[in-house]
Amino acid sequence: VRVVDLHVRSTSTAKARIDAIKSDLVRLPLQMNLSAERHFAMVYCDGVSASEGFLMQAWYASARFPCLAVGGSAGGTMDMKATYIGTREGVLREKALVIFCEMARGMSFAPFKSQNYEATEHSWLVAEADPVARTVKSVFDRHHQPIPIIDALCQHFHCNKDQLASRLDGFTFGVRVGSEFFTPTTVDGEAPSTK
């Protein structure tokens, strides 16, 4: 079991955060020789820290772990102000917990992915975003012009800004990479500004 600092407060750019996490991963002590055949890593990441992508970029950039990483984000309390991951040493915040697992000889494993989401017919291409703050400022409209995300959502749902939060009820946002969808933790339940 290893704890990885997500460098939420000590870095201000995506590159700086990835580099800091990678540096920690390179120095992470291991007590086993990892292999893709017998090992996997269970990863629990502070979802409110908006660092899942940074952690995995650093993970692969370190080229240190030749095994499958499985797991996900711990969401936190309903107000989405903090995530608390419990360990024997105490409660973790702004950290990831990595558990390296070894299968018994002769045993195997296979990952599966399950999400309870269905894609809608409408999507937007992000024009401007901040991956550190996990905010979207603008998307491209059908004329390929950037417009504020809130305006795009209001146009889509035929509502004004005051009605938007209620119109978004039952929906979540996802990012498509190839044929896979990734659904980041939403930050709050209030009417969105740029989040």
Residue locations for each model-derived region?
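Small-residue-enriched flexible segments
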Residues: V1-K195
